[in-house]
UniProtKB/Swiss-Prot annotation:
The lineage of its organism: Viruses, Riboviria, Orthornavirae, Kitrinoviricota, Alsuviricetes. It is found in: Virion. The keyword Lyase does not apply. Keywords: Acetylation, Capsid protein, Ribonucleoprotein, RNA-binding, T=3 icosahedral capsid protein, Viral nucleoprotein, Virion. This is Capsid protein. Residues 1-10 have a biased composition (Low complexity).
Amino acid sequence: MDKSESTSAGRNRRRRPRRGSRSASSSADANFRVLSQQLSRLNKTLAAGRPTINHPTFVGSERCKPGYTFSSITLNPPKIDRGSYYGKRLLLPDSVTEFDKKLVSRIQIRVNPLPKFDSTVWVTVRKVPASSDLSVAAISAMFADGASPVLVYQYAASGVQANNKLLYDLSAMRADIGDMRKYAVLVYSKDDALETDELVLHVDVEHQRIPTSGVLPV
């Protein structure tokens, strides 16, 4: 072997990477990408903050409390005369109520007016006695005592009013799914008669995850 061949062979040997160095670098890059993705998700979660009545939707899994999901029910108030009231107890699906000891953290009501809506309604959620028949007199008294937040939803000619949600926090009360039958959504039609096809109420109940939560919004 002449000198040039020896030099070339030495150069080639120096270029050869160490055994395993390439795979170690790839593994480090992959770990860095995973960490970056996790930090990105964390930043998005922190930026979103806790759900408030100003969020365009209630909560997805990243906005629920850790270990929580939510179930939704829809209420269609019947015709309500001017100055009169409507009340409906919260009845969750059987697949949820069988886990009656799971804690509930929040209830949110979203008001969805239909095209004919051109009135003003007051909406609240209250814990009511089991003996209550949700009569007009009983509901009127609950609106008047100031014990619960009230959403005043008014007709907006330009479309849906921005403030169309009411958030009710039950965390301090340690309420559970079994307690939900003790709560009711109450509506007061202040200025006009409300027709049956004018308003829809979506009620979101945030609760601890249950075994069937795979079919619930997450």
